[in-house]
Amino acid sequence: MTIDGDVHEISPFFQVRQTKWGGRACFSNGNIPKGTTVLQVSNFTGTSISYEFRKEVCHNCFAYANAKTMKYKLNYDYLRDLVCNAHYQINPKKFLGAGLWFCSEHCRTSYLQIPNIIELIECYEILLHHFPSMLKRYNYTSEQEEKLNSILISENVIQSSWDEIESKWIPRINNMKSAKRINQLPPTCEDEYCCIRFVCESLFNLKYMDPQCITYRAFNMLQSNELSKISKFPVLLHFQKLVFQTLYILLPSHLHRMLSIPLLRHILGTEYGNAFGLWQEGEASDSREYFGYWVFPEASYFNHSCNPNITKYRKGNSMLFTMNRDIKKDEQICIDYSGVLDLPTVKRRAFLADSWFFDCACERCKSELQSVH
């Protein structure tokens, strides 16, 4: 049976169903020939370009400049028509470019034509303005990180930590004047900066997304891997709180209204295990650059197989999922999560367990394990 009407309409080629062995999977609606693109998605909830690539990757089409800085930035002149008479926290004389770079005039123009994009640009600009001082104060030692990673994580530990933010930290911040709030910004490194931008974009996209659209409904139903991920890396709980605190202090009112602890936890919890890598196009898998990640809720219902019948690839700012062989009706449609299919069975399964929190039981793994024993 299908699990829910909310994700039944993802593709005419397959249905998302509850499996006999637990969990969800995609099953073909009919015979599908090799070469058929069963899903093409461009409605991501959020993207994150790694800090080291922020100037070398186009923020619209994700083209890569081969270690060269993109030629097209934003200056305030491009925003005049977007700002109009509305009150945005963008200083014409001190505009930094919002941390956005583009490969062409076309991509810059396309990005600026996104409805209400000035709101996201404002958030990026505010963050970029404060980031240098936050980074300057970032001095976590390996001993401090080791201490944070030594915490024994449970659902209660995570919940208690957020309860303290809600009951103590938020009321204290709310009672401060704006200038004093800024002094409460936590020290932040490059990884947190990129994650904050990812959450900003996710909040922005969710704000203007039709709640009845398939992307929104699929996002709400995504499985959170919060407990599994933080249990493995307890420092992430501290990381998440820094992200929330920064957003709570800096976000302008139009996106601040979207921010809540449950939504932030769902955004980050579903990113763990559901994000797709942003990879360089047109290069062999062993030589292409990894730029960051993005989340496509509709594409997150494919299960993994070490012998996948789908090949996934990026085309500009879209992801395509194409059959690499013929399949029959009711056959499960699977992708490769790992990119390590050439590894020996034991190492491959260990990598999947560490990275995606499941013990692979695909037909290839079962067959190879039987031959070993």
From Swiss-Prot:
Tree of life domain: Eukaryota
Keywords noted in UniProt: Methyltransferase, S-adenosyl-L-methionine, Transferase
Any one Pfam family match given in the protein's UniProt record, by short name: SET
InterPro entries in the record: H3K4_H4K5_MeTrfase, SET_dom, SET_dom_sf
GO terms (BP aspect): methylation
PROSITE patterns, A to Z: SET (PS50280)
Residue ranges annotated for the SET domain, each copy included: 12-338
Annotated EC: 2.1.1.-
GO molecular function annotations of the record: methyltransferase activity
SUPFAM superfamilies listed in its UniProt record: SET domain
GO cellular component: nucleus
SMART domains in alphabetical order: SET
UniProt keyword Methyltransferase, yes or no: yes
Family: Belongs to the class V-like SAM-binding methyltransferase superfamily.
Function: Involved in resistance to compounds that target ergosterol biosynthesis, including fenpropimorph, dyclonine, and alverine citrate. Since a deletion in the absence of these compounds does not have an effect on growth, is more likely to be involved in compound availability.
Name of the featured protein: Potential protein lysine methyltransferase SET6
